[in-house]
Amino acid sequence: MRGMKLLGALLALAALLQGAVSLKIAAFNIQTFGETKMSNATLVSYIVQILSRYDIALVQEVRDSHLTAVGKLLDNLNQDAPDTYHYVVSEPLGRNSYKERYLFVYRPDQVSAVDSYYYDDGCEPCGNDTFNREPAIVRFFSRFTEVREFAIVPLHAAPGDAVAEIDALYDVYLDVQEKWGLEDVMLMGDFNAGCSYVRPSQWSSIRLWTSPTFQWLIPDSADTTATPTHCAYDRIVVAGMLLRGAVVPDSALPFNFQAAYGLSDQLAQAISDHYPVEVMLK
């Protein structure tokens, strides 16, 4: 009888702990992330401190042709314990000599990256592709959250093409559904979705905005910039009943690292001109 009570208590504790586990996910445009930035110990310290807040972090504007900076970043993220973070990184993406990578860093004790692919947006040499930097989509499996499998679609939109690229994410979502049979999808990144790049009159032409399939978690009123501007450039959008239901209420917001760490304007903007946007899943 005593053994049965102990077993029951352990099962209850396990259920309680599992219920308390949440997954924190972020998208962070780290301005011109490369070897120069990773050679500055002060900046590295803060970048690692910021990224260590998250179980999955999408890093954008990775300018690192040989993955030297990415390697240094992972070394720093894993300095206290090996395999604290793993990563998935895209090839350099862009229509001309200027190229960027998408980088996902994630905690393998919380999630697994189980698959990935590049969205086929048309013929780049022909000039009829949709995105300047086509999404490199990653499928994750989480043992501890209400939604076990979900995909993340990253986008760093070109400012001048922001309206068209955000609208085209609707097609990317349909493609993910067709390829993986997956409805639970998070679309995130620096969409340049505000101020002069997306005018109020243009939202009605963006299917990702008008379709009830999608829930925008970062509002237009948010400021995701570390500069004197006030713009909601960086966004998190979710689709799928399980994923939408797993979002912790009021957890989606920019992380103002300048205020959190008491940084000067100069130091904050040396880290990046953007704040991360984050959300928690239960």
UniProtKB/Swiss-Prot annotation:
The active site is at 100, 156. Its cofactor is Ca(2+); Mg(2+). One of its GO terms (biological process) is neutrophil activation involved in immune response. It is found in: Secreted; Zymogen granule; Nucleus envelope. One of its GO terms (molecular function) is DNA binding. Principally in tissues of the digestive system. Highest levels found in urine, but also relatively abundant in semen and saliva. Keywords: Actin-binding, Apoptosis, Calcium, Cytoplasmic vesicle, Disulfide bond, Endonuclease, Glycoprotein, Hydrolase, Nuclease, Nucleus, Pharmaceutical, Secreted, Signal, Systemic lupus erythematosus. Disulfide bonds join 123-126, 195-231. It catalyses: Endonucleolytic cleavage to 5'-phosphodinucleotide and 5'-phosphooligonucleotide end-products. InterPro entries: Deoxyribonuclease-1_AS, DNase_I, DNASE_I_2, Endo/exonu/phosph_ase_sf, Endo/exonuclease/phosphatase. Its main location: secreted. Belongs to the DNase I family. It is linked to Systemic lupus erythematosus: A chronic, relapsing, inflammatory, and often febrile multisystemic disorder of connective tissue, characterized principally by involvement of the skin, joints, kidneys and serosal membranes. It is of unknown etiology, but is thought to represent a failure of the regulatory mechanisms of the autoimmune system. The disease is marked by a wide range of system dysfunctions, an elevated erythrocyte sedimentation rate, and the formation of LE cells in the blood or bone marrow. This is Deoxyribonuclease-1. The gene is DNASE1.
